[in-house]
Amino acid sequence: LRARKFKIGYVPQYGGYFHDLTLLENLKAVGEIIIKDQRKRQEKIASLISKFALDNVQEIKAKFLSGGQRRKLVICMALLGDPKILLCDEIFAALDVLTIHMLKEILVNLQNENPKICIIICEHQARELLSIVDRALILSNCKIIAEGSPNNLIKDEKAKSQYFGDFFKN
């Protein structure tokens, strides 16, 4: 409830949904807590289902959805309250390349459509993350070792030695 008060949406690395409920039931369950007006709630849910191309799976139980569909469901759940801050924990974890590409497009589109939303992503897949962010921090042992634009981070000697290694060499 505190997150709702401060307009924060959270996308966990794993889970974050009710396995035995359908995609639609998951959205309705969370929507009832976040959006009191039934008409607005139904409109928001319908809009998110359409926007995330989940129309054809809305009656399927969450446990039977693909990894990408589940991740989209959890993003939709996080967006129900129109957050000002969206926290994403390891959003690309355990997903195939095509699904990662799809999620990157979703995040970029979300930022473009809502320029005031701040999307914070904790992610180990540097190449994937740096291709879509404006700014990044690299942490090591709970300390910031480098920060800046993706281009600057790739060139940063401390970031190279402690995190990237030869990862970005041609």
Residue ranges and their predicted role:
Residues 61-65:
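Conserved ABC ATPase signature
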Residues 14, 21-32:
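Q-loop/switch helix immediately C-terminal to the Walker
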Residues 1-9, 14, 153-157:
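ABC ATPase NBD coupling module
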Residues 86-89:
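Catalytic Walker B motif of ABC-type/P-loop ATPase nucleotide-binding domains
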Residues 75:
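Hydrophobic anchor residue at the start of the ABC signature
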Residues 39-57, 108:
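Conserved ABC ATPase "signature" region
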